[in-house]
Amino acid sequence: MADGTIPPEMQDKYLKIILFETERLTDLTRDLLTLNEFDTKDLLLDKTSFDIHEVIRNTAESFEGTCTAKKITIELLFASRKLHVYADKRKIQQVLYNLLDNAIKFSGTDSSITVETTERGEKVFISVKDNGIGIPRSSLNKIWERFYKTDASRGKDKKGTGLGLSIVKEIIQAHNENINVISTEGVGTEFIFSLQRG
């Protein structure tokens, strides 16, 4: 661009490509570093008691620009005003980020995503539900595998490394908790995970 080989009317297009690829490589590097923590078997969880609703709100707000551009709304349905869990706050924030990122990525315009919390005994359940394209039944067991994308058409235009859900599952399992997925093609997907009450 500096030497004038790219015409001014094309510069915006190429800058967007550069930005997209920079973000993709940043995401890949972050994901690989996170997976490396799990591979060393030395993953130390920094567990504290914190308000999961505050973390959900902050994570949802970080997607405000993307949601506005796609006309997607994120609805938060909370069991109570405050709800404390005992977990690694930074890692749970990463779980929520990855799940919301996927929900937005695979949702169409003018759609909504719901994040809901429920309490059952000593457990807190967090659900992230979208009205997106859904996951084929044949792929449901494979989505947790590293670098897995359900098919070329699903991943072709979608920014992603295929590591997000693998990281999500490993973080939840490191907390000795569970994560499940319910999905119907053409209807949407719901991820539900549990945490210990704090």
State the predicted function of each range:
Residues I6, M10, T40-L45, H84-A87:
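Conserved micro-motifs of the catalytic ATP-binding
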Residues F20-L25:
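Short alpha-helical segment of the dimerization/phosphotransfer core of two-component systems
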Residues D46-F50, T68, T73-L83:
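Conserved catalytic submotifs in the C-terminal HATPase_c
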Residues I52, G134-E145:
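Short helix N-cap motif at coil->helix boundaries in the Bergerat
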Residues A103-I104:
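Short helix-loop "hinge" at the ATP-lid/N-box region of the Bergerat-fold HATPase_c
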Residues D110-E122:
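Short beta-strand/loop element within the Bergerat-fold HATPase_c
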Residues N176-E177:
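Conserved glycine-rich
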